[in-house]
Amino acid sequence: MPFSTPAQPSCSAASPLRLRYIDASTAQKIDEDLMSASGGFSLDQLMELAGLSCAQAVFECYPPTKYPNVLVACGPGNQGGDGLVAARHLYHFGYEPVVWYPKQGKTELFSRLKVQLHNLGLPFVSQDDFQDALEEADVVLDSIFGFNFKGDVREPFRAPLEILKYESRIEFEARKKMPPIVSVDIPSSWHVELGNVNKAFTPSVLISLSAPKLGALAFAGRHFLGGRFLPEDLEAKFDLQLPDYPGTEQVIEITGAKPLQTQEADL
């Protein structure tokens, strides 16, 4: 039974703009510069700010009054950490998050993030219960794989990503709609430079962090930029030409943004 198409999020479109789309190597260098002695940031600081950005984007597009149940799907790396942080903020924003986190990151940071969620009473669903959690969700936050993902998708992530890809094969009770998907930085299993070459799922909303990735050029849904922490000298070093964030916002919509004219000849 195919799902009916979910309503489009009620976000206002931003004016067309140009900014730099970056590859995985540049994204890695930006993170390294931020966490260097001269950059001064720690990983948990960047993760906190990134997760807050993601939670705010979800709130702007899918408010808790209409979309209270969020399934936060987390991977074992830093991308998953962003999702854990986002789940905490979503709880405080009035949502009822459920976390799918089948493979925990190895450092103490991930353990502490998980403890924070347990202390709020957030439920964690088992590895095999992804589909059941999906049936109850109003929104899915995809924070499984980030810009460092390479190779084939393996379990325990392969089956859930296949479910999202072939959602029309699932039959929900009471004719529930397939929930919209919000992806963090790059949709899980997309190639960071080439885009959806693996024919994976396509989210409704994408939240690029620091700067949009080259693989997002073909993304046609709602597109946000988050991670309001880059100093001006770092933006200039990589010629990112990022837009200004309004007021106290942690995200800015960049739907329809084009690459810099100096990039177009190479794309």
From Swiss-Prot:
Keywords of the record: Cytoplasm, Isomerase, Metal-binding, Mitochondrion, NAD, NADP, Nucleotide-binding, Potassium
Domain YjeF N-terminal, first and last residues per copy: 27-242
Catalysed conversion reaction: (6R)-NADHX = (6S)-NADHX; (6R)-NADPHX = (6S)-NADPHX
Listed Pfam families: YjeF_N
Enzyme superclass (EC): isomerase
Residues the record lists as binding (6S)-NADPHX: N78, Q79, G80, G81, D82, G146, F147, N148, F149, K150, G151, D152, D185
SUPFAM superfamilies listed in its UniProt record: YjeF N-terminal domain-like (SSF64153)
Cofactor(s) needed: K(+)
Domain of life: Eukaryota
Cofactor info, note text: Binds 1 potassium ion per subunit.
An example Gene Ontology molecular-function term: NAD(P)HX epimerase activity
Residue sites binding K(+) per the record: Q79, D142, S188
Cellular localisation: Cytoplasm; Mitochondrion
Annotated EC: 5.1.99.6
Any GO CC annotation of this UniProt entry: mitochondrion
NCBIfam families to which the protein is assigned, alphabetical: yjeF_nterm
Similarity annotation: Belongs to the NnrE/AIBP family.
Function: Catalyzes the epimerization of the S- and R-forms of NAD(P)HX, a damaged form of NAD(P)H that is a result of enzymatic or heat-dependent hydration. This is a prerequisite for the S-specific NAD(P)H-hydrate dehydratase to allow the repair of both epimers of NAD(P)HX.
The protein's name: NAD(P)H-hydrate epimerase
Organism of this sequence: Mycosarcoma maydis
Classification of source organism: Eukaryota, Fungi, Dikarya, Basidiomycota, Ustilaginomycotina
